[in-house]
Design a protein with these regions (language model features):
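A short alpha-helix capping/helix-coil boundary motif
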Residues: 28-31, 121, 176-180, 188
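Substrate-gating cap/lid region and adjacent catalytic-acid/histidine neighborhood
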Residues: 1-132, 143, 150
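Residues in flexible loops and secondary-structure boundaries
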Residues: 73, 122-126, 156, 169, ...
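Tryptophan-rich aromatic "cage" segments
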Residues: 88-95, 100, 177-204
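Mature extracytoplasmic/periplasmic domains
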Residues: 154-182
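A structural signal for short secondary-structure junctions
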Residues: 108-109, 138, 165-167
């Protein structure tokens, strides 16, 4: 926890206390989760949220999702290979080094949704795809096809996906074997980074 707090203070200076409130690190378990959340927000999540929020403000139809379905294990023929950070496969001695360097992924990794959305599972012989994987892929393709055709992903046989900005609370779809809508609880984190990056770009 002390090292985590020190890194946060180095990165954020006078705003570190607010960061530590939004991403607390009182225990090792909390540090692991908060450091993961903070790194993800800095790398990808905040910018994706900002992009979606600006389109929403402009009146565009925006439908946000969180992809939560992890890939299945690799087929036995892959013989100890490991998945790359954002796609691809690492084999043999390089794979052993990768396993040591990286902890096991929790949930779905970045880029894992692509082959599901494109319906390409059968062409990827690395993983032992299951009926549940096919189910998730069909769900995503249904939403994508509807959005391309009509600007609205909803359609017969699909769980209702609320448009961003509908209702009193911000909502998004969680894509998994059992898709469901979740209320956004992290907006304060994104709004903090919005202010932080605007201050960085403002003239002194």
């Amino acid at each position: 926890p002390e090292h985590y707090a020190a890194v946060v203070r180095e990165l954020y200076g006078e705003q570190a206390d607010e960061v530590l409130r939004l991403y607390p690190g009182e225990t090792p378990e909390q540090v692991e989760q908060s450091a993961t959340d903070l790194a993800g927000d800095r790398f990808l999540v905040y910018s994706t949220w900002k992009w979606a929020d600006e389109h929403r403000k402009a009146g565009c139809p925006v439908y946000r999702y969180y992809y939560a379905h992890p890939r299945p294990p690799m087929v036995p023929e892959m013989d100890g290979a490991v998945a790359g950070l954002a796609g691809g496969v690492i084999r043999n001695s390089d794979a052993a080094a990768q396993v040591i360097a990286m902890p096991p992924a929790k949930g779905a990794v970045h880029s894992a949704d692509i082959e599901y959305a494109m319906g390409n599972l059968a062409t990827n012989r690395v993983y032992a795809w299951t009926a549940e994987d096919e189910q998730v892929s069909a769900l995503m393709q249904g939403y994508y096809a509807n959005f391309i055709k009509t600007g609205d992903p909803n359609g017969p046989g699909l769980p209702t996906w609320p448009r961003l900005g509908e209702g009193a609370e911000e909502q998004y779809m969680v894509w998994d074997v059992h898709p469901h809508v979740r209320v956004e609880r992290n907006r304060a984190r994104y709004e903090f980074h919005d202010r932080f990056y605007q201050n960085l770009s403002s003239p002194a």
